[in-house]
């Protein structure tokens, strides 16, 4: 059976390098095929994230904190809410980008990058 296609939601700090993001994806979602990336709008133009999306030849979707904040997620974070105005970036972005999931990889931090993945359906 081929690996499932997923959209990976990503939360990261400003200035995170493409190499760090690639390493996190290799380690964090190795059992899945990446069909897209998603994040919060304020990180949409991060050079490292743009480079990884281009390398993978997948779309990068972004959502406002307001859009992300209405998504029910299993692992909300108070620190995230305080920092960016929503309790979830990675899980909520993955779920929004896929139209509701399901979430196949709950939030995890790999090399300082927060990852979550939701099943991509064509």
Region annotations inferred by a language model:
Residues 26, 30, 54-61, 97-101, ...:
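Generic secondary-structure signature for well-ordered alpha-helical cores
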Residues 18, 39-40, 81-83, 93-97:
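A short linear-motif detector with a strong N-terminal bias
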Residues 24, 51, 91-95:
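Alpha-helical scaffold segments in soluble metabolic enzymes
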Residues 1-41, 118-122:
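Conserved mixed alpha/beta catalytic, RNA-binding, or beta-rich assembly cores of soluble enzyme
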Residues 5-8, 35-36, 61, 101-104, ...:
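Structural motif
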Residues 40-89:
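Long, charge-dense
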Residues 91-122:
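C-terminal edge-of-domain segments
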């Amino acid at each position: 059976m081929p690996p499932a296609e997923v959209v990976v939601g990503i939360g990261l700090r400003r200035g995170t390098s493409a190499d760090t993001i690639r390493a996190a994806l290799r380690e964090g979602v190795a059992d899945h095929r990446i069909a897209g990336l998603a994040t919060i709008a304020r990180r949409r133009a991060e050079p490292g994230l743009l480079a990884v999306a281009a390398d993978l030849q997948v779309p990068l979707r972004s959502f406002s904190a307001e859009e992300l904040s209405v998504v029910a997620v299993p692992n909300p974070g108070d620190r995230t809410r305080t920092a960016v105005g929503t309790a979830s970036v990675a899980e909520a972005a993955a779920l929004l980008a896929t139209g509701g999931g399901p979430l196949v990889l709950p939030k995890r931090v790999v090399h300082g990058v927060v990852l979550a993945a939701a099943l991509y359906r064509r």
